């Protein structure tokens, strides 16, 4: 058993060029120790409070944006005013369940795009993100 439970988090932060502060390490463990997931700053703040980690919502926001800038997370905006953070950095797309706000990964090879519009001169496509929005079948009928 590892005598230093934060060793992997410290290495992760160092590789990303971030100083491993106590709060960053605690939030990184919450984020990355459970595998791939999607969550908002409010979700992570709630998890931190439940784990007795003393951190403000502003610190959670700042840390998530630092992790995103360092390449540890991917930020997604799927509804106005609400950003989700994705720990899965591989190529993939998403289902967004409008009823619950949950997000589920779709492997990139299961989505096919046959044609894109002509892009403006002097630009290049950096990536294409697909978000498939889902509702319960009853809501779609109405």
Q: Language-model segments: what does each one mean?
A:
Residues 1-33:
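Intrinsically disordered, low-complexity serine/threonine- and proline-rich regulatory segments
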Residues 26-29, 43, 59-62:
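Amphipathic alpha-helical interaction segments
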Residues 40-52:
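DNA-recognition alpha helix
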Residues 60-70:
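Basic amphipathic alpha-helical segments that dock to polyanions
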Residues 69-142:
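Non-DNA-binding regulatory cores of transcription-related proteins
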């Amino acid at each position: 058993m590892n005598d230093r439970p934060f060793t992997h988090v410290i290495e992760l932060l160092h590789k990303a060029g971030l100083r491993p502060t106590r709060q960053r390490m605690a939030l990184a463990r919450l984020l990355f120790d459970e595998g791939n997931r999607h969550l908002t700053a409010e979700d992570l703040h709630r998890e931190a409070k439940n784990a007795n980690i003393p951190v403000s919502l502003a610190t959670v926001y700042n840390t998530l944006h630092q992790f995103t800038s360092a390449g540890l997370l991917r930020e997604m905006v799927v509804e106005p005013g609400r950003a989700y953070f994705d720990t899965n950095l591989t190529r993939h797309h998403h289902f967004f369940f409008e009823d619950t706000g949950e997000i589920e990964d779709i492997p990139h090879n299961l989505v096919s795009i046959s044609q894109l519009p002509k892009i403006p001169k002097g630009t290049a496509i950096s990536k294409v993100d697909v978000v498939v929005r889902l509702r319960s079948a009853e809501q779609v009928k109405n």
